[in-house]
Amino acid sequence: MTYYESTGHLLLTPVDRAAPARTVRLRELGLGERVDTELDAFARRIAEVLAAPYAGVNFINEERQFFAGLHHAPDAPVSGYPARALPRDHGYCPHVVVRRRALVLEDVRDFARFAGNAVVDESGVRSYVGAPLTDRQGMVLGTVCAVDLEPRRWGTQGLATAKSLAAELVEIIHAREDALRAG
């Protein structure tokens, strides 16, 4: 069951003081407002490498989180997940962004902070691995992530892989930024 504070936010949603600056930075980079086929392909790669049915490249601004890159395996169950846009207090990526560290949840129901989240209740997500996308300015823009509808052991290898994919994607983002500046 999902629980809300009187403010309408999920309980235990992290305070994100960097959201206003991140929103400006995402606009500068042209990220987080539209679907990006290159990022869809990158999400597909995340899913393949981590052998996960769902994967995404997620950017989080002041208003929402947006999966500019998203992959749903053809043989994965249709559960209403994943969606391109989610409220900031749904899912696990906002926690990765605020913590500035990767997060592995082998069974999300084992953690009170995450067990009552809407993506558990409404979409059946049971397992998550995500790593932050930290740019050259030290701003965490969003995440790369993979989820499963079954509990699973991502292990240290899965964590290392998510971090490596995040670093690779940050290099792509930097190359895009350099091309914009050279313009």
PLM regions with names:
Residues 137-148:
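Sensory beta-strand/linker motifs that couple input domains to effectors
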Residues 99, 136-137:
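Residue-level recognition of short loop/turn positions
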Residues 126-135:
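A short, aliphatic-rich beta-strand micro-motif
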Residues 25, 54, 60-68, 76-126:
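Regulatory sensory and allosteric helical modules in signal-transduction proteins
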Residues 33-68:
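Helix-loop-beta substructure at the N-terminus of cytosolic sensory domains
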Residues 1, 24-28, 183:
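PAS/LOV and related PAS-like sensory modules
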Residues 6-12, 16-19, 147-183:
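Juxtadomain coupling helices with adjacent low-complexity linkers
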Residues 21-37:
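Short regulatory/linker helices and ligand/cofactor-binding micro-motifs at input modules
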